[in-house]
């Protein structure tokens, strides 16, 4: 049926004869549909040009929101934190791939080098304060979201996906180091790397000599000269042998550790500050000793341990007898056993970081202070003696470029997808790299369009879809790019300070301003969160900064690199199994074979290979589809491609809920058009039916749905047609036109005609193509007009574009130069003798897409591997389309 049959019948301004003429033969109706007057009359009848300046716009309809309406996010207190597998691509990835799949092609090597490792060096990076690390997306659940986001980051760190910043030049992580990380290695499994031992020895000797000075100074004043000579010998370039220097270093270390056991715990923090100052070469040791003693005589204590005299005296007596932990009054907040062990002391930087974190520990400060009221956090902290460590150290420590104590993007949590609200997903806002004058121009890669999917996957095969678990986190990132991928948490103290009313005084390092965060809401929330996180609540309350070790999802570079990675894998699979079809889009991989048994054999082989390479497949999401594949929201089988039922139901629901004769703001039109566009290629009129909506969006005006236009859209979207696969055939029908006439040439006849009035050349060419399709039924036409070749009909008059899309549905075009077009003379009113037609063979459109690589034959020289006997006859291997 004609798409405008019912619509023209319902328009009263069109007479009966005019309607019959518009619905009549195409050679008479198509030029009339291109007329400007008819299009204006139909637009007026459909109320598409109603002025809406004096009417109040509607900003929400159904679940679609427009201008001035904010959609509140929903926070789920019972979100499940995802558990990430130990994702680690093998260090010998290229060698293993060659062992399994034979020598890699040039394209495969080029793509894999882009992602192993990934590099990202923008021209400019803006750093934000740590306070913006966790975004307040849920005002009613601020504290809950804060701890959930911090827990998510620590989960990623424990899985080896994030680096933990120790200082501005050091990073630590868990897992196996990659080959490029070995070059910057400082520590691995608690042992110093060879390249770092010498520098660590020098720093330890300098630090130990400073503590030795304190011992000699208090024994005898005359020993001051001896210690100064010893310190001079440490810094001078002595000409002694290596054995003597090693003996001196061991002796200093034994004296250092022996004296350390007798130093009170409260005096450790000043000694660490003295150690950092002693590392400078140009300082006088006598001044340093005097400064140390003066600070000690003043009764210097850290702010977290300022308590009553009885508690202080009791704790000091106990720390003189035990150098491992505070027994009763001091819980082991930061693993003080490891910090005070000989291995922990010699690590200079690491021990100082632990002590610095313990000094700024909010939990420790509340433990020692008196409660300020009923809802003071002291009651929660003092209920448990051992709250666990303040921070963690990873298995590996590496050097890094200068990493500031800032972040480059904020984070927040959302539902994993619209259909799964029980699990959470991390959203990282790295949008600064896509904005401003210094924005990064991301590499472009083509996404397969609908016709390409139909040409490649519309076959009668057995289908299987695979899902790569945490696909982005498979791609490692170079450590040099870490300063651009920084996320973190400001800590509970700073985060809660911003929420309190008296947060104008930000000097939170003083005891008197510590209790201003105590409130009934925070107290009750922490009690509830303790049931979820337990002792980990203390760890999550500390500030930290992390950098991505694997590829984050919030950067425009990530989709491109993931597409290169998966396309290289599918290229190798197709090359080794030419009787199968492998295709990938981002993290979704599909396999196709002619029989279920053969598909099972290929699947088991690929799973074992991917697991050995370190690629984790989500077994729960592996689906066997049979002959009907569900992929990218489409249903694909031998007949063609159709949208899935859930998308059709969504479109129908939204259209039925649209109010009539009420102006909708253009933001609602934008979102509605995005939903309708997904199903538009399967309707009779395609995208051209939405042209009135596009015009309202472009002019930033409201749009009014009339009952006629709404019912017409419902009828269009109620009848969907599949997008069929294109066939490779030889062109046998050609069309051409002039502003006043048209011509058609086939293998056996020449046809020509004239228009009643002059038309634009592009419009005339489109009408000629429509006439050729109607009269010959050919699915392949030759034309010399680039506008018709593009298939984009939205630039033509609205009525003509809708009807032309209906007539030319499923039609392909071949370009023929005007000089070689056999329909050129008939379009000018000349009918010469028939000549042989130019030989133009049409090839189905696959475009240049990065997700599909042409696979050359496998080299014969490759290692012996398991032979998979195919049930398909391989004498003439079947090549997928």
Swiss-Prot record:
Residues 326-340 have a biased composition (Basic and acidic residues). One of its GO terms (biological process) is symbiont-mediated suppression of host innate immune response. It catalyses: DNA(n) + a 2'-deoxyribonucleoside 5'-triphosphate = DNA(n+1) + diphosphate; Endonucleolytic cleavage to 5'-phosphomonoester. Residues 270-279, 287-314 have a biased composition (Polar residues). Residues 385-726 are annotated as: Polymerase/reverse transcriptase domain (RT). Multifunctional enzyme that converts the viral RNA genome into dsDNA in viral cytoplasmic capsids. This enzyme displays a DNA polymerase activity that can copy either DNA or RNA templates, and a ribonuclease H (RNase H) activity that cleaves the RNA strand of RNA-DNA heteroduplexes in a partially processive 3'- to 5'-endonucleasic mode. Neo-synthesized pregenomic RNA (pgRNA) are encapsidated together with the P protein, and reverse-transcribed inside the nucleocapsid. This is Protein P. It comes from Ground squirrel hepatitis virus (strain 27).
């Amino acid at each position: 049926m004609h798409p405008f049959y019912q619509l023209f019948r319902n328009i009263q301004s069109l007479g009966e004869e005019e309607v019959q003429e518009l619905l009549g033969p195409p050679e008479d109706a198509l030029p009339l549909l291109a007329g400007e007057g008819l299009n204006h009359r139909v637009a007026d009848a459909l109320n598409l040009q109603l002025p809406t300046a004096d009417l109040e716009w509607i900003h929400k309809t159904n679940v679609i929101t427009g201008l001035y309406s904010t959609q509140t996010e929903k926070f789920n207190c019972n979100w499940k934190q995802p558990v990430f597998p130990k994702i680690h691509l093998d260090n010998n990835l290229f060698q293993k791939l060659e062992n399994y799949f034979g020598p890699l092609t040039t394209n495969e090597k080029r793509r894999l080098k882009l992602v192993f490792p990934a590099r990202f060096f923008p021209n400019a990076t803006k750093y934000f304060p740590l306070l913006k690390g966790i975004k307040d997306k849920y005002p009613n659940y601020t504290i809950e979201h804060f701890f959930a986001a911090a827990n998510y980051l620590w989960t990623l760190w424990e899985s080896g996906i994030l680096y933990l910043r120790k200082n501005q030049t050091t990073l630590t992580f868990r897992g196996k180091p990659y080959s490029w990380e070995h070059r910057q290695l400082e520590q691995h499994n608690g042992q110093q790397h060879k390249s770092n031992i010498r520098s660590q020895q020098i720093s330890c000797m300098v630090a130990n000599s400073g503590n030795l000075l304190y011992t000699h100074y208090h024994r005898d004043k005359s020993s001051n000269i001896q210690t100064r000579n010893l310190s001079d010998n440490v810094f001078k370039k002595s000409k002694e042998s290596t054995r003597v220097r090693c003996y001196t270093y061991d002796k200093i270390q034994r004296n250092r550790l022996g004296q350390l056991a007798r130093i009170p715990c409260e005096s450790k923090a000043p000694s660490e500050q003295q150690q950092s100052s002693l590392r400078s070469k140009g300082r006088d040791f006598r001044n340093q000793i005097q400064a140390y003693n003066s600070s000690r005589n003043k009764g210097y204590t850290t702010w977290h341990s300022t308590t009553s005299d009885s508690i202080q005296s009791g704790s000091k007596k106990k720390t003189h007898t035990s150098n491992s932990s505070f027994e009763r009054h001091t819980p082991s907040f930061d693993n003080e056993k490891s910090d005070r062990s000989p291995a922990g002391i010699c690590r200079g930087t690491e021990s100082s970081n632990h002590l610095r974190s313990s000094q700024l520990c909010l939990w420790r400060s509340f433990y020692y202070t008196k409660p300020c009221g009923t809802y003071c956090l002291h009651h929660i902290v003092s209920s448990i003696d051992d709250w666990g460590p303040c921070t963690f150290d990873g298995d590996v420590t590496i050097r890094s470029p200068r990493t500031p104590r800032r972040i480059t993007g904020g984070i927040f949590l959302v539902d994993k997808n619209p259909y799964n609200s029980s699990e959470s997903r991390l959203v990282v806002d790295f949008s600064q790299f896509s904005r401003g004058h210094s924005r990064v121009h991301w590499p472009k890669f083509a996404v397969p369009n609908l016709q390409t999917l139909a040409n490649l996957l519309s076959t009668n095969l057995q289908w299987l879809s695979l899902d790569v678990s945490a696909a982005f986190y498979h791609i490692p990132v170079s450590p040099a790019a870490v300063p651009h991928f920084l996320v973190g948490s400001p800590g509970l103290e700073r985060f809660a300070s911003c929420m309190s009313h008296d947060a104008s005084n930000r000097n939170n390092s003083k005891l008197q301003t510590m209790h201003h965060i105590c409130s009934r809401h925070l107290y009750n929330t922490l009690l509830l969160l303790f049931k979820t996180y337990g002792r980990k609540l203390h760890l999550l309350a500390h500030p930290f900064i992390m950098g991505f070790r694997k590829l984050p999802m919030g950067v425009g570079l990530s989709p491109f690199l993931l597409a290169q990675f998966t396309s290289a894998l599918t290229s190798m699979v197709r090359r080794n199994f030419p009787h199968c079809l492998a295709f990938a889009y981002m993290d979704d991989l599909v396999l196709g074979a002619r029989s279920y048994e053969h598909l099972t054999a290929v699947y088991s082989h690929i799973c074992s290979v991917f697991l050995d390479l370190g690629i984790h497949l989500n077994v729960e999401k592996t689906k066997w589809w049979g002959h009907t594949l569900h992929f990218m929201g489409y249903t694909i089988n031998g007949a063609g491609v159709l949208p899935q039922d859930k998308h059709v139901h969504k479109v129908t629901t939204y259209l039925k809920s649209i109010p009539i004769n009420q102006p909708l703001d253009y933001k609602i039109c934008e979102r509605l058009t995005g939903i309708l566009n997904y199903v538009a290629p399967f309707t009779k009129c395609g995208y051209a039916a939405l042209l009135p909506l596009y015009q309202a969006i472009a002019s930033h005006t409201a749009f009014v749905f009339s009952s006629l236009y709404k019912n017409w859209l419902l009828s269009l979207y109620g009848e969907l047609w599949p997008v069929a696969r294109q066939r490779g055939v030889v062109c046998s029908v050609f069309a051409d036109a002039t502003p006043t006439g048209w011509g058609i040439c086939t293998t056996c006849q020449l046809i020509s005609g004239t228009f009643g009035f002059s038309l634009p050349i592009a419009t005339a060419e489109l009408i000629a193509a429509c006439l050729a399709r109607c009269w010959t039924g050919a699915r392949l036409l030759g034309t010399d007009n680039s506008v018709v070749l593009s298939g984009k009909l939205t630039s033509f008059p609205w009525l003509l574009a809708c009807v032309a899309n209906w007539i030319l549905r499923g039609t392909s075009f071949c370009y023929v130069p005007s000089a070689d077009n056999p329909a050129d003379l008939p379009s000018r009113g000349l009918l010469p003798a028939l000549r042989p037609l130019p030989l133009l063979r049409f090839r189905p459109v696959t475009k240049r897409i990065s997700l599909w690589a042409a696979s050359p034959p496998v080299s014969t020289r490759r290692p012996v591997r398991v032979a998979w006997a195919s049930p398909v006859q391989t004498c003439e291997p079947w090549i997928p389309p």
